From Swiss-Prot:
One of its GO terms (cellular component) is cytoplasm. Coiled coil: none annotated. Belongs to the P-Pant transferase superfamily. AcpS family. It is an enzyme of class 2 (transferase). Transfers the 4'-phosphopantetheine moiety from coenzyme A to a Ser of acyl-carrier-protein. It comes from Cutibacterium acnes (strain DSM 16379 / KPA171202) (Propionibacterium acnes). Its main location: cytoplasm. It comes from the Bacteria. Its EC number is 2.7.8.7. The gene is acpS. It is found in: Cytoplasm. NCBIfam families: acpS (TIGR00516), pantethn_trn (TIGR00556), PRK00070.3-2 (NF000832). GO terms for biological process: fatty acid biosynthetic process. Mg(2+) binds at residues 8, 50. This is Holo-[acyl-carrier-protein] synthase.
């Protein structure tokens, strides 16, 4: 059963400009592993987290640091902990599907939470 679906788009040049203006934004929104990646990968991970929040019904009370987008070979997946793991458990989420892409200056993420 599908519990939630989320989609988000992030313009990579806007992400880069925002990071230039607010350097602390990266530390707040991305884990250390994500923060050292190229801008296009950072933007994709930001979009992934936004899509996850949408799929879980909103981001209130959730920490950006409580999820990390992990690459396993060609596939990407979330590692959830803390507030995000609790929210997923409360909703009955058993599996989170994640798809990421970046092309033509845009990063796109789609998340499906399955129970």
């Amino acid at each position: 059963m599908i519990i939630g679906i989320g989609v988000d788009v992030c313009d990579i040049s806007r992400w880069e400009a925002a990071v230039q203006r607010h350097p602390g934004m990266v530390r707040k929104m991305l884990t250390h592993t994500e923060a050292v990646m190229p801008a296009r990968s950072q933007a994709a991970r930001f979009a992934a987290k936004e899509a996850l929040y949408k799929a879980l019904g909103g981001g209130e009370g959730l920490s950006w640091q409580d999820c990390e987008v992990v690459t396993d070979g060609e596939a990407v997946r979330f590692e959830l902990r803390g507030s995000l793991a609790r929210r997923a458990e409360e909703l009955g989420v058993r599996r989170v599907h994640l798809s990421l892409t970046h092309d033509a200056g845009v990063a796109v993420a789609m998340v499906v939470c399955e129970g």
